[in-house]
């Protein structure tokens, strides 16, 4: 009887989307709750409706020099490149991920998964600057868990875990699109990853967030008004070249920032 009850509880937890092993990082769980509580979203869960779409192209779209990230309490710069994202043909809410990370000159390969947990629709469609009609037929957000494991044979390797958010829209032709409708706004961002990186060697987690154009929960790292701009006190943490390239317009360093480091 006990065994049957245990199995039933296990199945119920799986159906509800709870994790049997491990928990989300605290910051990730808080971000998830806040995102789902946003009054701009319609309450109904729409995951089943949208898993028929392939979200992978939305995660591979942004030029890498516009993907910004930090690791640790001192906001050390980290660069992340997703090389591939492949939808699981059996489980449409799961994607297999391959990519690379770089902190300074230390580069690691990683593989893992992104698993969709929630999809919600916006109550109101956004419009571009100087337009009165939205290009979207529907607009919304995706919230997913990610687990990205770096190659254990490489130096300073570990595991990235957390929650990611992607803003999307369906255009008038029914195609899924990367949501850049509000790209002219000062706070525009997309594909936000909020979580931790945990080293294999000591199992100690460090905050590690990244995303397109801005970084969520970046504290006083980002002091930019119209665009991301690292505070001068963090330039020594890997942000010097970024600042010279994009804040001060050094074209030679811009070319270096745009080079494929992966």
Where are these regions (language model features)?
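Bacterial Sec-dependent N-terminal signal peptides
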Residues: 1-25
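Tryptophan-anchored aromatic micro-motifs
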Residues: 24-83, 93, 97-102, 130-152, ...
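Mid-length scaffold segments of soluble, non-membrane domains
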Residues: 94, 101-115, 122-125, 134, ...
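Extended lipid/amphipathic-ligand handling interfaces
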Residues: 114-118, 163-173, 180-181
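Exposed beta-sheet edge/beta-hairpin loop segments within beta-rich domains
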Residues: 181-187
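Long, charge-rich, low-complexity intrinsically disordered regions
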Residues: 200, 213-216
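Short, solvent-exposed mixed-charge patches
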Residues: 260-262
